[in-house]
């Protein structure tokens, strides 16, 4: 690979990073707080690509082999097979094209029902006491927050309150569905699902296609859908709490699909 192409690829990778982080597409992959770092990384790659391209153009008549030998300071005189070793790096640089193709051809969506259905961790124990819910009903609550309060606090802070939960439908083995939403700490690679089991569904919502986004308004009731009907949401990372449905509506996917 000639040095000009190396510089162009660096610029393209930087442009792709800037493109997805300038709008809201980056929220499908990382937390909102990562945006400044993405913008900085994209800008640095673009600058490095421009510098590499300018340097290649300045060299003009210098052959690719000579330029590479000068840059890497390879001195293997008399050693057989040096030529192949020297060109291993430039060949590997073609891998930088992959993220460009992924974003422009088959950009992956945010994690949804497929990932949630295969996740057995539904919550993690709170490290400290959770604050009371704000006044006023219904109160919007993150799905992960609802699960934590229902499981690890036995629903104490939810009792008698009407909550509003937003997530996507995940099919269950018995032909029903659960409301789920993925939670991330840093990026999609460390995501896990928070799921609740709606009970008392109206007939129109008995069967909902997977990945349909819904807002459920209702109240906490004791129970654990992961315990085969056993009473009580026992403190367990796999427990799936219940929510008694008061109303339900199909909604657009949020700009930020993660909790």
Named regions from a protein language model:
Residues 1-259:
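OB-fold and OB-like single-stranded nucleic-acid-recognition modules
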């Amino acid at each position: 690979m000639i040095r000009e192409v190396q510089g162009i690829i660096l610029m393209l990778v930087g442009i792709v990073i800037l493109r997805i982080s300038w709008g809201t597409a980056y929220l499908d992959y990382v937390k909102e707080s990562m945006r400044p770092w993405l913008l900085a990384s994209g800008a640095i790659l673009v600058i490095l690509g421009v510098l590499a391209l300018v340097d290649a153009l300045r060299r003009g008549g210098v052959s690719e082999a000579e330029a590479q030998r000068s840059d890497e300071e390879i001195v293997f005189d008399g050693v057989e097979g040096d030529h192949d070793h020297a060109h291993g790096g430039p060949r590997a640089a073609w891998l930088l094209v992959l993220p460009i193709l992924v974003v422009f051809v088959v950009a992956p969506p945010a994690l949804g029902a497929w990932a949630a259905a295969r996740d057995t961790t539904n919550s993690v124990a709170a490290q400290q006491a959770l604050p009371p819910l704000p006044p006023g009903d219904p109160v919007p609550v993150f799905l992960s927050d609802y699960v934590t309060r229902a499981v690890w606090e036995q629903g104490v802070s939810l009792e008698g309150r009407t909550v509003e939960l937003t997530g996507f439908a995940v099919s269950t083995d018995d032909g029903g569905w659960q409301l789920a939403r993925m939670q991330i700490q840093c990026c999609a690679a460390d995501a896990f699902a928070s799921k609740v089991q709606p009970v008392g569904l109206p007939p129109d919502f008995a069967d909902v296609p997977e990945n349909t986004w819904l807002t459920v308004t209702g109240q906490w009731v004791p129970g654990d859908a992961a315990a085969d009907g056993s009473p009580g949401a026992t403190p367990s990372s796999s427990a799936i709490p219940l929510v008694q449905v008061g109303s339900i509506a199909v909604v657009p996917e949020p700009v930020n699909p993660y909790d």
